[in-house]
Regions:
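Short alpha-helix carrying the canonical HExxH Zn2+-binding catalytic motif
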Residues: 1, 5
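Acidic/His/Gly-enriched intrinsically disordered linker/tail segments
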Residues: 7-132
């Protein structure tokens, strides 16, 4: 994944490059041959952070404010944010918006025009907590 990112989107933010790379740690192919990420061992780390109210916002993640704080949590957060977008068929469009030079917040606003950043973050957290 890293080699493909370096070719297709060399300016990709670290959180996206690592989120996509870790997304495919556990994956399957759908009937059309497309790779789809699935839940994996990183899920409990993320769920625990949400329950303890220790998870930074998606805005903080995309702004690069969180990587040094807790690497395990950072990787889980980036991975499951990509999985969240994948489940909603927005991962490809989100990637393309970023590649066009939009920030993560701008890309989310284009894909979720009727939702605030806080609403998207809340939807993400609720979705993560229901995963098994």
């Amino acid at each position: 994944t890293h080699a493909l990112m370096a070719f297709d989107f060399p300016a990709a933010p670290d959180w996206l490059a690592e989120g996509l790379a870790s997304l495919y740690e556990d994956c399957r192919r759908d009937s059309g041959g497309r790779l789809l990420g699935e839940t994996n061992w990183r899920l409990p780390v993320l769920q625990q952070a949400i329950r303890r109210r220790h998870l930074p916002s998606l805005g903080q993640l995309m702004d690069g404010e969180t990587r040094a704080a807790d690497a395990r949590l950072w990787y889980a957060h980036t991975r499951y944010f990509c999985l969240f977008l994948q489940y909603r068929n927005r991962l490809g469009p989100f990637y393309r918006e970023l590649r066009r030079g939009r920030s993560g917040s701008e890309a989310l606003a284009r894909l979720y025009p009727d939702a605030s950043p806080a609403q998207i973050d809340g939807e993400f957290r609720a979705w993560v907590l229901q995963l098994r």
